[in-house]
C-alpha cells in the first residue's frame, strides 16, 4: 500500500515538474497580463473626451485654460502637438508628435494630456520627460506594455502605414 502511494506521488511529482507544466503557466500569465492591458486601453479610449478633430475643437473652446492640461505647453509646442494628431475612423488616436511634450512637461503633465485621448499608456515611451514629483515617479515606475503595438520613432501617415519619423509615436490603431 505504501509503495503504491509513493509510486503515485512520485509520478505526480514528475508530471508537475515536467517542462510542459512550466511552459504553459508563464504563457497563461503573459496572456492574462496582455488581456488586462488591452481592457485598460479600451476603457481609457471609451472614457477619453477627445476622439476626433471636432472633439478637440469643442474641448479647446469649452474648457477653461486653468482646467485644460494642454495649456501647460507653450503656444508653439501646443500647436505642433495638436497639428500632429492623427485620428482613425474608429475615434482612436492613431499617432502624434511627442517632442514638445517631452521637452516642456513632466511625466504627470504628459499623462494628463494623453488621458484626453485615451492614450496615457504611451507616456512610458517618452523617456526624456522630467520627473519632478511623486506622481511622476509612480507613473514612470508603473509597468506598461506601451511598446506592444505602438511604435516610437514612427508617424502614422495613412491607414496601417507607419513611416520612420523621430519624436513621433505611431499607435496600433493607425
Where are these regions (language model features)?
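Bacterial N-terminal signal peptides
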Residues: 7-16
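Positively charged n-region of N-terminal signal peptides that target proteins for export
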Residues: 1-4
Amino acid at each position: 500500500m505504501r509503495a503504491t502511494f509513493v509510486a503515485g506521488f512520485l509520478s505526480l511529482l514528475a508530471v508537475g515538474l515536467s517542462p510542459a507544466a512550466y511552459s504553459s503557466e508563464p504563457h497563461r500569465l503573459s496572456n492574462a497580463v496582455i488581456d488586462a492591458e488591452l481592457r485598460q486601453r479600451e476603457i481609457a479610449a471609451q472614457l477619453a473626451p477627445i476622439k476626433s478633430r471636432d472633439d478637440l475643437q469643442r474641448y479647446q473652446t469649452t474648457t477653461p485654460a486653468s482646467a485644460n492640461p494642454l495649456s501647460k505647453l507653450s503656444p508653439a509646442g501646443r500647436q505642433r502637438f495638436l497639428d500632429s494628431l492623427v485620428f482613425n475612423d474608429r475615434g482612436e488616436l492613431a499617432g502624434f508628435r511627442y517632442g514638445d511634450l517631452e521637452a516642456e512637461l513632466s511625466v504627470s503633465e504628459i499623462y494628463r494630456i494623453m488621458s484626453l485621448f485615451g492614450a496615457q499608456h504611451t507616456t512610458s515611451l517618452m523617456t526624456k520627460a522630467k520627473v519632478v514629483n511623486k506622481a511622476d515617479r509612480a507613473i514612470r515606475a508603473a509597468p506598461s506594455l506601451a511598446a506592444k503595438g505602438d511604435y516610437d520613432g514612427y508617424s502614422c501617415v495613412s491607414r496601417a502605414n507607419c513611416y520612420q519619423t523621430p519624436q513621433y509615436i505611431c499607435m496600433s490603431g493607425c
